[in-house]
Structure formats: structure tokens, C-alpha cells
Amino acid sequence: MPRYALVELGQCEMAEREAIALGVRAHGLEVERLFEGTPESELADQGPWLIQLPVQPSGALLETLALHAGVHHALSMVGSSLALGDLAIHMRSWLEGLIPPDPTIEGDESCGAVLRWFDPRIGLEMPGCWPAADRQQFMQAFQWWAAWRADFSPRMVQGSILNRAAPRAEPLPLDQTLLLALDQLNTAETMLASVRENDIEPGELDHMAPALQRRLAHQLSDDARRLGLGEWADQYMLLAMGLRLHPDIAKAQALQPMIAAAATGEQGLGAAIADVDNAVWQDLVEAAPQVLALHSHALLEPLRQRRLAAVSAHPFHIPRTEVR
């Protein structure tokens, strides 16, 4: 059965993109740039690439994909009996969505949208938000689809045993309910990008690997929901403080009354923390490096253990007898 790497180059720095392109050429791999022939064709070299893998990929190839795409959560893997060209046709037809006019806005018009299922940070979850018939039609091209969560734990979804291309004839309609569901998939990523862009000084997070930032963003987003912070501004504030001050900021005892007040709507978290004594912040900042090191260890240790384990123990391992 053919296996493919789906790489979202848009999440990688230019040097990483060049390394991936060089690896594709060096190993003589066939590749389909999924944005080619679509309204996003000018971004074909930066958008998702579907790369057909050899029957037995070399260690060097897998290392290239891991170091330059996987570490950025820009890599997923697909198993499908479809040929590369047929699978690419299927995938391209599922890139377009259509947001209908808002009936509450006079003169509003429909607009197109890119369905970012190729982004492994949210992609494997996205079809689960679609209507059942659309989800089944999309997934029947795959036997399986695998990626890694924010903590690099493996995630796999099963498709169909009998694969066939099922291209869409028109964009997928995106009503308000579906748009909200898709937006919620991306909450942590959106907030992290906003914090990086708007709320940090140059170099402030350089001590923290991007993968660790992403892991903490998801943890802090989960913490916000667990603590009942329903307002986007309060969730954002908790995430920003966690990245800038202390990764376990949600557990800080001195902040619990303020977090509780924000959860009930009594006072926003941003306004409440203005009254926190400077000594509290200083204690949190001084304790942060040790706690951050523990989070880093917790993120990396499972990866080290998987590297040391037998190949057959890997969650994505396919025995030779099943490789065609």
C-alpha cells in the first residue's frame, strides 16, 4: 500500500522548506503541490505538498521530514491504495469552502475560504466537524491518516479499507455552526500566534522552543476552560501570562480569587491582575525556569523512549508483510 507524507510548508521557516525540497530531490521522490491549479496556486511552493514515500523509507529521509517538518507540527502521514495523482485530485477538490451571506447583514455576499485540513495541528479533527456524508466522502480516499498532537503523542484516524477518489464538485458550505466548530479547533494556535505577534518583546521567548510554546499554549487553553474562563480575553490573558511569567500560572494560589472572579464575570482577569503585589510576580518569575525545565522533560522523554524502543513498537509501524 502506498504511503505518503503530507507536509504543510507554510508552517516552516524558509531554511526548513529548502531542506525539505532538497530532500525530495535527493531521494528522487514524486510530489504533488496541492495548491497547484487552485485559487491559491501562487502559494504552491509554500502550501501543502503530498510526497509519495518509498516502500522502505531511508533513515535519512525520515530524519529530514522529522527535523524540518515534524518538529514544527507540519507533518502528517497518509496510507492509501490510490496512486499519487488520483489522491492529489481528491485532496485538491476538498480545499475550498464557501461562507454563505449573513442574512442579518444587508448586501452581504458569500466568500470563499481555504479548508485547512492539511494543517496537522487541526487537520485530523476537522472532518469530524463536517456533516457525516461529507466526512465519509473525504475519508474514503484514505486507509489511515496519522499525525502528532501538541505533546508529540501519536494520533491516528481510520479511513476506508477500500479506497477511492471522491472529488467534490463544489466548495463545502460553511454555515455559522460549522464555522464556530472549526474556529474552536484552532483556539490555542490563534492565541499563541497573537501573543507572539503582539505581547512579547523581541527575543523574550527565545529560551523556549516553539514546540514547547505550542504544548504550553494547549495546556493553558485547557486550564482556562477547566477554570471556567469563558471570555476570550480572559483565556488570552492566562495564556500570555503562562508563556511570559510561569507555565503553571493557572495553579498560582495568589491568583485563584482573581481567576474565580473572572470565571463568574465579576471582573476581567486583565483588570484584576493590576492589583497583584509585585512580590507575587517576582516569586513566579524566579520559580519559572525550574518548572519550565520539568515541562520540557515531560515533552521530550516520551520521544526519547520511542527512539530507544524496537521499531515494531512504534504506533505507526506497518509490518513488511503489509507493505505493497
Residue ranges and their predicted role:
Residues H72-A74:
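Glycine- and acidic
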Residues M1-G37, S41-D45, L50-I51, Q56-G59, ...:
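A contiguous, surface-oriented mixed alpha/beta subdomain in the mid-to-C-terminal portion of proteins
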Residues L50, L67-A69:
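Partner-binding and oligomerization surfaces adjacent to conserved cores of proteins
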